[in-house]
Amino acid sequence: MAKKGAGATRGISPVRPTRAIPIGAYLTVADNSGAKVIQVIGVVEYHGTRRRLASAGVGDMVVATVKKGRPDMRHQVVRAVIIRQRKEYRRLDGMRVKFEDNAAVIVTPEGVPRGTEIRGPVAREAAEKWVRIGSIASIIV
């Protein structure tokens, strides 16, 4: 039997940030894809129970609709990865992390960002899980 916590230093961080962004939430778009505000309409790979409203946290991919932005982007259904959330969550080292806003980056279904730059900081959990997002991020917290 493996020692307790043997794989904690390899690969993706085992931290599961608090799921604080429910269906219906509005998110700021932090890239230059053309969208400004999106509304969450679903969470990819969420398996709830008993009619529970799906919710997402940092690093999760969501399905959303564009509410504000360029005319060609508005009313489109897109996929996005959450990179910041207001609700604080705890990392394994005891540090608690929270951001000023709830923000996401629009991506393709494979996880490749549609924009070429990201405004503001990106949570380390999202940058580790989605490497292409981490590569274009200017600040990783």
From Swiss-Prot:
GO terms, molecular function: large ribosomal subunit rRNA binding; structural constituent of ribosome
GO cellular component terms, A-Z: cytosolic large ribosomal subunit
HAMAP family per record: Ribosomal_uL14 (MF_01367)
Source organism phylogeny: Archaea, Methanobacteriati, Methanobacteriota, Thermococci, Thermococcales
Family: Belongs to the universal ribosomal protein uL14 family.
Organism: Pyrococcus horikoshii (strain ATCC 700860 / DSM 12428 / JCM 9974 / NBRC 100139 / OT-3)
Function comment: Binds to 23S rRNA. Forms part of two intersubunit bridges in the 70S ribosome.
Gene3D superfamilies per record: Ribosomal protein L14 (2.40.150.20)
RNA-binding listed as a keyword: yes
Family matches, as PROSITE patterns: RIBOSOMAL_L14
Assembly information from the UniProt record: Part of the 50S ribosomal subunit. Forms a cluster with proteins L3 and L24e, part of which may contact the 16S rRNA in 2 intersubunit bridges.
Keyword line: Ribonucleoprotein, Ribosomal protein, RNA-binding, rRNA-binding
Pfam families assigned to the protein according to its UniProt record, in alphabetical order: Ribosomal_L14
Biological process per Gene Ontology, one example term: translation
Protein's UniProt name: Large ribosomal subunit protein uL14
